[in-house]
């Protein structure tokens, strides 16, 4: 009796199942390259300043790509911060794609959210290591990385909650609850 090889299923961590494999690979590549440059850059590039600058540029690229491209293409979410010029107040704006017009694959969602939450955990570990080693200059770079990654993590988490709440409200108003209540009331009137 011969067993069939397991076929990859939607939701597996296999980039070939992604609806947007180029976006996914660029997202993971940029995200991983900042960590790798921080960890191993000094082995290949002997100048600390150059490693610092390259890591900082990779962190900025990661922040931008995640916020503006990967978030929108992989999970249909986007966020930004607006400042009212008259009062100076700032507020977060969340945008999600219409669930009826856009299909988001389980694989893309899984890669996105796993990477979104695991990366700050790595940077927290590196911050603890920098504190233990009393390396203030490396700690400054890790703090910048933490600010950028945690900002994206918090913003996308809020955006996802906002998206789920608005989707629930739209479904309730568009057909589910409202039509049941209206049907029940009309049914009682014409009995």
From Swiss-Prot:
One Gene Ontology biological process: vesicle-mediated transport
A Pfam entry, by short name: DUF846
UniProt name for this protein: Golgi apparatus membrane protein tvp23
Family: Belongs to the TVP23 family.
Topological relation to the membrane, as annotated: Multi-pass membrane protein
Glycosylation sites: 84
Transmembrane intervals: 17-37, 39-59, 111-133, 137-156
Keyword Transmembrane helix: yes
PANTHER family: GOLGI APPARATUS MEMBRANE PROTEIN TVP23
Location of this chain's protein in the cell: Golgi apparatus membrane
Job of this protein: Golgi membrane protein involved in vesicular trafficking.
Protein species of origin: Aspergillus terreus (strain NIH 2624 / FGSC A1156)
GO terms for cellular component: Golgi membrane
Keywords: Glycoprotein, Golgi apparatus, Membrane, Transmembrane, Transmembrane helix
């Amino acid at each position: 009796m011969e067993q069939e090889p397991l076929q990859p299923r939607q939701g597996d961590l296999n980039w070939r199942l992604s609806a947007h494999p180029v976006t996914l690979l660029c997202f993971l590549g940029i995200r991983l390259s900042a960590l790798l440059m921080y960890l191993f850059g000094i082995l290949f590039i002997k100048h600390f300043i150059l490693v610092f600058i390259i890591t900082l540029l990779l962190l900025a690229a990661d922040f931008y790509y995640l916020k503006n491209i990967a978030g929108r293409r992989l999970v249909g979410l986007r966020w930004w911060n607006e400042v009212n010029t008259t009062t100076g107040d700032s507020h977060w704006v969340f945008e999600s794609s219409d669930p009826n017009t856009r299909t988001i694959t389980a694989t893309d969602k899984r890669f996105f959210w796993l990477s979104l939450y695991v990366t700050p955990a790595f940077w927290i570990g590196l911050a603890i290591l920098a504190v233990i080693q009393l390396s203030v200059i490396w700690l400054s770079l890790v703090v910048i990385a933490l600010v950028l990654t945690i900002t994206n993590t918090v913003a996308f988490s809020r955006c996802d909650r906002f998206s789920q709440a608005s989707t629930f409200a739209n479904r309730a108003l568009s057909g589910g609850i409202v039509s049941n209540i209206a049907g029940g009331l009309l049914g009682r009137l014409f009995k």
